[in-house]
Amino acid sequence: MKKEEVYIVDFKLENEEIIKQYFYKWIESRRHIPKNFTKEIRLMSVRPYYMPCYVCNLKIQLDYTIRVQKRYKIRRGMSTIIDDNEMFYIKDYSLFASQVIPRYDMDQISPYDFSKMHISGDETKDAPKEKFIQVYDDCINHYKGAVMKKLEDVINKKLLKQNTKEMKKKFYKVKSHEIIDEEFYKVLVPVWVCKYSYNMKTYYCIFNGQSGKEFGHTPSRKIDKIFISVVIFLIIMIIAVFYLYI
C-alpha cells in the first residue's frame, strides 16, 4: 500500500550557532589530517535542508539454507545443512533518495525517529525541500544488498537460540525470497549541511537535524616528501655500510 501524502520529520536542532559548535567539535576530533588543518579551514555556510527519503515496511517470505558445523575443542564434526523458511519483517526502513547528498553519507547519520513525522506543510523551520526525483522501485533495488544483510542477521540470531555454543554457525545461501507485502511513505528528513574550504578545495559535513549525528569528509595527511627522501637516503646508507663491512 502506498501513501500519496508527503510527510516530514521536523528539526529538533534548529539553532545555527549550535550546529557551528558541533561542526568545530567534529573538526577537532578528526585524526590523520594535514598539519594546521584546524587553523586553516574556513566555514563557508551552514544551511538546513529537508532531504527526500522513502520509509518502508516490508513483509518478506524467504527460504534459506544454513551450514552448521559441530566443533568440540580441536576436533570438528561433519557439516550439516538446515533448510528452513521464515517470515521476515522490516519496519521503518530508510531508503534515502537525495540527488544532492550521497546515499552512503545519509546512511551514516541515521537513524531518524519516524514516529515524529507529520504531513508536510506545517513544519516549524523554513528550509529548502528537495523534490522526490528518484522513484521507490529504484531505491529498493539500490538497497537490496542491505536488506539481504538484515535477512542474514535474522537467520543467524535464530541459530544462536537453537544451537549450543559448540556449534559454529554460518549463513550459507538464501535460495529465494519474495516481498509479499509492502507499505512505503514519502518522508522529508531534516539535515544540516556545513560547507567548508581548505587549501582551495571544498568539503562538506552533514548533521542529522534530529539527533546531531554527523558524517563528513576531510583531507588526509600526506607524508612529507622531504621526510620520505631522508628515510630513503638513510636506508641506502645503511645498506652501503653493511656491504662495505662484509
Q: Model-derived features: where do they sit?
A:
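Surface-exposed beta-strand edges and their flanking turn/coil or helix-capping segments
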Residues: 24, 68-71, 207-209, 218-220, ...
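Charged, low-complexity helical/coil segments in non-catalytic cytosolic or luminal regions
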Residues: 2-197, 202
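C-terminal single-pass membrane-anchor helix
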Residues: 221-246
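Juxtamembrane amphipathic/hinge helix adjacent to a transmembrane helix
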Residues: 196-221
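Short, low-complexity, polar/charged sequence segments that are solvent-exposed and flexible
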Residues: 74-78, 213-215, 224-226, 234-235
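Functionally constrained cores in energy, signaling, and assembly domains
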Residues: 10, 14, 31, 214, ...
